[in-house]
């Protein structure tokens, strides 16, 4: 699962299958902004979950 770019922001997901959790690191023009934490079930987080979290973040921050 690669990075997602939107309007100068980069969203880089990473996750732990063992712990069943992950985070999306948010960067703006290369500078770290914050981390969006999430949980998932199964071998990998669903790509739709990542997209939904990124879309929600962009909506909340008017990106």
Curated annotation (Swiss-Prot):
| Highest taxon of source | Bacteria
InterPro entries xref list: DUF5370
Record-given protein name: Uncharacterized protein YbxH
Q: What is the lineage of its organism?
A: Bacteria, Bacillati, Bacillota, Bacilli, Bacillales
Gene behind this chain? Answer: ybxH
């Amino acid at each position: 699962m690669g990075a997602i770019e939107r309007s100068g922001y980069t969203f880089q997901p990473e996750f732990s299958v063992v712990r069943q959790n992950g985070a999306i690191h948010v960067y703006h023009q290369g500078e770290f902004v914050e981390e969006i934490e999430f949980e998932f079930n199964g071998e990998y987080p669903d790509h739709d979950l990542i997209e939904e979290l990124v879309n929600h973040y962009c909506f909340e921050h008017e990106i």
